Each structure stands twice: as structure tokens, then as C-alpha cells.
Amino acid sequence: MKEKDFQQQVISIARMYGWKVQHSRAVQMANGRWATPIQGEAGFPDLVLVKSNHDGRGGVIFAELKTDLGRVQDHQKAWICALHAGGAECYVWRPTDLLNISHRLSALSSHVAVTQ
């Protein structure tokens, strides 16, 4: 499965459960290079998911998406480590994790261990 197809599945699941989704899309520059025109350090996770309920509970998840064979780059690992150190919930999700992803996104308070 291509990463963009997997990403669409994750976004659909997140929206089904009421999560707000942020994804910065890469664009092709005039010189043919691909870039994401935002400022910041390279390697920021692909998705930021945010949810709050009427009872005041909420959650924020940072998710780096990879194909089943995709490799997490060093600059991506650095972001994941920094986010974890700051107390954030952060995952590397792969297509084989879809059931666990769905379970995690269906609940606010439970943290489901997912492949890294």
C-alpha cells in the first residue's frame, strides 16, 4: 500500500471518530524538487490529530506514517524522541497497524501500543 493511500485511511478513521486532522502537504517546486512550505525542523510527523469532548477530556496525537517497509529517518526519530520527552503521544503507524489505530482513535484515554 502506498503511504498516501494509507494516510487517507488514517484520516478517514480519525474523522469518523471526531478527531481534527492537520497534515502539511508537500508540493513540487519549479525546479522539480518536492518541499513542504512551512518553517521548522525537518522530520516533523505527518499528522497531528486533536480531539476534545464535551466532558473536557481531550487528546493530541502525533503520527508518522510509513509503508510496511518504510524506514524512519534519523530526523524523524529526533522529532519523535523530542515529542515523547515533552510528554506527547506520538506513534509510527504502518498499514499493518490499522486495527490498533482504529481502536486508539475510538477512545480518548487508552493508549494502544503500536509498532515502531
Please report, for each region that a protein language model flagged, where it lies by residue.
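Catalytic phosphate/metal-binding cores of nucleic-acid and nucleotide-processing enzymes, i.e., regions
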Residues: 1-116
